[in-house]
Amino acid sequence: MGSGGSVGSGVPATNGQPLIELAGVRKSYGLGTPVVTEVLHGIDLAVTRGEFVALIGPSGSGKSTLLNIIGLLEPLTSGEYRLLGQSVASLGDAELTRLRSEAIGFVFQFHHLLPAFSALENVLMPQLIRTGHFDAAAREHGLALLAAVGLADAAHKKPAHLSGGMQQRVAIARALSRGSPLVLADEPTGNLDTHSADDVFALMRRFNAERGTAFLIVTHDPRLAARCDRIVELVDGAIAPRPAA
């Protein structure tokens, strides 16, 4: 994977297999009321397998809304969205939940770890929610993920006994626990100091390089955006052209 932060539109320069494809996607709030507000205006965006993409833009530009649509957390108003080649428009709630669980891992600015559970239990939480239990094989998988993020000795510690950077490492391990081909990260380093932010970013890049996991990362940190494969900029709900440097 490169680390040069190439600029451009929402369409990748490579011919890799798309994980996500958005065409003409619009999002409006207040439909059926006197005041309708469109916050996304005809978004065309594709992310291919193994890409590491930064999504940047000022506050209020629609980044989180776009990430929620890609993550199947809220519906689009019009346009088309295909995830793993499948149009999501005709899918029911159960099918959307299944597809989201299989295809996408999430990392947020605030790690959303459950304070009553250990680091290992938090990593395994997606399986626990899905099946009601986790077996010995899942436990070994969770321990291996924690080792991979440098937390082998913290498996049984509660989040309150971990630093902010360590908590975010647990969140990354949790996002990767299902083997999803895509991770959506909304300001994953925004609540960390510079050193911890660099460590967490390097960890995501390592998983990207070693496992081929694609990452779409919302960030306000220009240093980190410059180290991504590609930068997509949202301005006022639309993808802005980014001239070559």
Functional labels for PLM-detected ranges:
Residues 18-227, 231-235:
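ABC family nucleotide-binding domain
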Residues 1-28, 240-245:
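ABC-family P-loop ATPase nucleotide-binding domain
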